[in-house]
Amino acid sequence: MLISNLMSPKSASGALVAMLLVCGSVDAKAQPSPYHEPPERHVFDGVTDDLLTAGLGVTGLTQQPGIAEPSKLSEWRDRRRRAIWQSWRALVDLRRWAYGSEARIAGVEYVAHVKASERLPESSFLLQIPASFDPNKPCLLVTAASGSRGIFGSLPTVGQWGLRQGCAVVSDDKGLGMRVTDPTGGWRLTASGHIEPIARAASPFPHALQMAHAHASFESEPHWGRLLLRAGKLALQLLAAEYPERAAFTAENTLIIAAGISNGGAAVLQALEADDAQFIDAAVASEPNVHLAGAPALYDYATLHAMLQPCAILAENLTEAPLGIVVGMNLARHTAWCERLAQDGLVSGSDVTSRASDARQRLLQSGIEPAALRLGAVNLQFGLWTSVAATYAQTYLRRGLNEPACGISFTATDAGGQPRELQVSERAALFSDGTGIAPTAGINIVARDAAGGLSNANASSYDTARCLRSLSTDISNLTQSLIVRGRTGQRPVIVLHGGGDALIPIAHTSRRYASLATARNPKFRFLEIANGQHFDAFLAIPGMEPAFVPMQPFVDRSLDDVQAFLTEGKALPASGILR
């Protein structure tokens, strides 16, 4: 049963819950509400609907949810269910479900939208309180969504662990998610998934969509850690509203663990460096997208891959490489790419074989692992590098819709590749189906050349890749605010990373971070998963196994380890390479 905006079964707490949600504190005059609107409160019975699987259970997560009519997605319950279903399928390998039975978890859920302040952008967070939560032995898992995802973007990876332990879980979207605006179409998608009309605006790029990660007026990335801390502190207030009969929940009387993967892992490590008050007791970060002094940032190595990998892939063993067969079907395109690189003096060699070998060698020399290069065909097939570079270029250069970097826009396209307006049914599915970064949910990447011609850039073109790469020097100067220094405090912290990670290179991120953190914190541990890679869901692709293993079991085990250290005094695992 779903009950929205109603009191807890603990009826005595109902009035105080309502007051705290509106005021943000017991004394409304002392502190104005941090929220755009009172957080929505929902209760789930664990049978027809639940916190972990939206009532779908394990079986339902592996099937298409029963939502046929797009109009039904106007209801929060249906948007939520589809969003949770999409997150599970995108982030974990459901073939390896190991959480028991149908894994439905009853409890209370808050959805909150926090205002921007002078120091922090707006963001949304999800607070889930399982029925097994013990207010007398409270624990809170604080996390942030991976990638550019919305509030459900960490539920399958770290949120599920917290819920199964009886911990409350708060997940912040880092100000990203599917906040989408179509100025020429006259509508916007709010953080809660509602379509709202806005005044139409003329644009030289009709139907170009404004997306939060690419175009937000307040760049959130330098603040991901503080957003995570803000969500954690507000979560304690909501817990106090939910359990008014006990003393206030504070960092001193609540076990608080921070955890996240990818961009969520970066948010965790940023939070540790900003956490002077020791709000967090322990942390786990998997494959974190962190920027270290002296190392290239994500944009740098993404654009290097975008330039070289379409040629370098021909130097891999395509009969064994996952999706290598797709490269074999497009040899002419890859051969031509090698030719263009040679013409521009970016690779050496007199034929395609020598040029591909040189391109591969240049990637290796830049610090990319051979195991990661083996996944080059997967990266190219999914347009990974163009997706990353196209969004981050707009973000770092602070480009608006009318002055896009490299002529790149995000828009729906017709059969001829021309921009069009998203249909009503497509807009209805954006919140649930979108990842926050194009291409996604019917939103494509298009590039305009100097003459105004359009091309679909989901899979990139040589000219688009070259343009994006040309911005790397300017952008590297703009990413200095993202540098982390390995300051974790004297608390248990485990960082883990796959040696075959083909998105976030281990040599430029976690290994460097570990060398700094280990010297400062005797409770810091670094686990390198030799055969791990970035996307567990990719393990279902033919050719991925047995060469690669899932990261999720190591994430769960690391969370078990820091919890046992804090609650039972058990020793932390030794740092090392796990095979």
Predicted region positions:
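Bacterial N-terminal signal peptides that target proteins for export
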Residues: L2-A15
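Bacterial N-terminal signal peptides
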Residues: G14-G24
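Sec/Tat signal peptide C-region and signal peptidase I cleavage site
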Residues: V26-A30
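C-terminal His-loop and adjacent cap/lid subdomain of alpha/beta-hydrolase
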Residues: Q31-R579
